Design a protein with these regions (language model features):
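A short acidic, often aromatic-flanked loop/helix-cap motif at beta-alpha or helix-coil junctions
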Residues: 6, 83-87, 143-149
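Short secondary-structure boundary/capping segments
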Residues: 12-14, 44, 129-130
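Short, basic/glycine-rich phosphate-binding loops at helix/coil junctions
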Residues: 20-23, 67, 150-157
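Hydrophobic beta-strand residues in large extracellular and virion-surface proteins
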Residues: 21, 52-53, 75, 139, ...
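Nucleotide-sugar donor-binding patch of glycosyltransferase catalytic domains
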Residues: 78, 109-182
């Protein structure tokens, strides 16, 4: 860790008796964002054994994350509660980060944290995989069902029907990848 957790988060984590997983469930484009229902399945399984911190930004994401945290055990939203520097301190103390193809995964990787990344219509071979991460932690959409992936570098362009490609990554696979990274 580069720094310790801010005091207010330590209280929520109740002494750090379990590994802490960061989850950043949003991305700039919906084609790179796992559905709420699948993410809830992942969180439901992981919160049984681990503490989970939710990351995001902006009013809409912050509200969604707070709602998700309130409906789960061992799940806390840090969105909108800390300045960026303190959020980075929190990320630097995680055991693993689960992220979409988005900035939070890159920030965690730069801080030396293991990152499990979900890829929808983008692909890590396009050059944007988080730094120094195991390729096995890049969870990809089904390339047989969606053979045109990657459809774009940023995920903003995709053929009709590809917007749900990320949903071919099953929640059980995500949970196992996170557990294997601990």
């Amino acid at each position: 860790p580069t720094k310790q957790y801010p005091f207010s988060i330590l209280k929520a984590l109740d002494g750090l008796s379990a590994p802490v997983i960061g989850i950043a469930p949003f991305a700039a484009h919906t084609s790179k964002t796992y559905s709420k229902s699948n993410m809830e399945k992942v969180i439901y399984e992981l919160q049984k054994e681990y503490k989970i911190l939710l990351f995001g930004g902006g009013t809409e994401e912050t509200e969604k994350l707070q709602e998700l945290a309130l409906s789960s055990l061992n799940v806390f939203s840090v969105a909108g509660k800390f300045p960026l520097g303190e959020e980075l301190d929190i990320i630097s103390n995680l055991n693993v980060m689960l992220s979409m193809d988005s900035s939070n995964g890159h920030l965690a990787a730069m801080l030396g944290i293991k990152v499990v990344t979900l890829w929808g219509v983008t692909h890590p071979f396009a050059g944007f995989a988080p730094f120094n991460q195991e390729p096995i932690n890049n969870l990809l959409a089904d390339r047989i069902e969606y053979p045109r992936i990657p459809t774009s570098i940023y995920g903003n362009i995709f053929p009709k029907g590809y917007e749900l490609a990320i949903e071919t990554i099953h929640p059980e696979v995500v949970v196992q990848a996170v557990k294997n990274s601990l």
